[in-house]
């Protein structure tokens, strides 16, 4: 039987090609490739080029990372360098636990 794989849809709002924007994108791509390789879609939105998109999504600061799917929508504003903080903030940390993790926890 073919199991449907969950896809994570994220948007990263940045302001131009600033050091903060570049660092946020690089860090986020590293996290996504390590944890969700092949099961994510990331759209990078430059709010200087597309201010209407930022306004529609009520983005007030950059960088802002928004998880669109799966629900619920979650947002993280600012520094994305702390992997665990990003995963918890987006409500993704617990979904990465494997069966072995669950077994190890139940044996405690």
Swiss-Prot record:
Gene3D superfamilies in UniProt: Glutaredoxin (3.40.30.10)
Keywords recorded for this protein, A-Z: Biological rhythms
Signal peptide annotation: none
Keyword ATP-binding: no
InterPro entries associated with the record: Circ_KaiB, KaiB-like, KaiB_domain, Thioredoxin-like_sf
A biological-process GO annotation: circadian rhythm
Pfam family, one: KaiB
Presence of the UniProt keyword Nucleotide-binding in the record: no
Family matches, as PANTHER family: CIRCADIAN CLOCK PROTEIN KAIB2, KAIB-LIKE PROTEIN 1
Family per similarity comment: Belongs to the KaiB family.
Subunit comment: Homodimer, interacts with KaiC. The KaiABC complex composition changes during the circadian cycle to control KaiC phosphorylation. Complexes KaiC(6), KaiA(2-4):KaiC(6), KaiB(6):KaiC(6) and KaiC(6):KaiB(6):KaiA(12) are among the most important forms, many form cooperatively. Undergoes a major conformational rearrangment; in the free state forms homotetramers as a dimer of dimers. When bound to the CI domain of KaiC switches to a monomeric thioredoxin-fold (KaiB(fs)). KaiB(fs) binds CikA, leading it to dephosphorylate phospho-RpaA.
Function according to Swiss-Prot or TrEMBL: Key component of the KaiABC oscillator complex, which constitutes the main circadian regulator in cyanobacteria. Complex composition changes during the circadian cycle to control KaiC phosphorylation. KaiA stimulates KaiC autophosphorylation, while KaiB sequesters KaiA, leading to KaiC autodephosphorylation. Phospho-Ser-431 KaiC accumulation triggers binding of KaiB to form the KaiB(6):KaiC(6) complex, leading to changes in output regulators CikA and SasA. KaiB switches to a thioredoxin-like fold (KaiB(fs)) when bound to KaiC. A metamorphic protein which reversibly switches between an inactive tetrameric fold and a rare, thioredoxin-like monomeric fold (KaiB(fs)). KaiB(fs) binds phospho-KaiC, KaiA and CikA. KaiA and CikA compete for binding to KaiB(fs), and KaiB(fs) and SasA compete for binding to KaiC, thus the clock oscillator and output signal pathway are tightly coupled.
Note on domains (UniProt): Has 2 forms, fold switches to a thioredoxin-like fold (KaiB(fs)) when bound to KaiC.
Protein name: Circadian clock oscillator protein KaiB
Higher taxonomy: Bacteria, Bacillati, Cyanobacteriota, Cyanophyceae, Nostocales
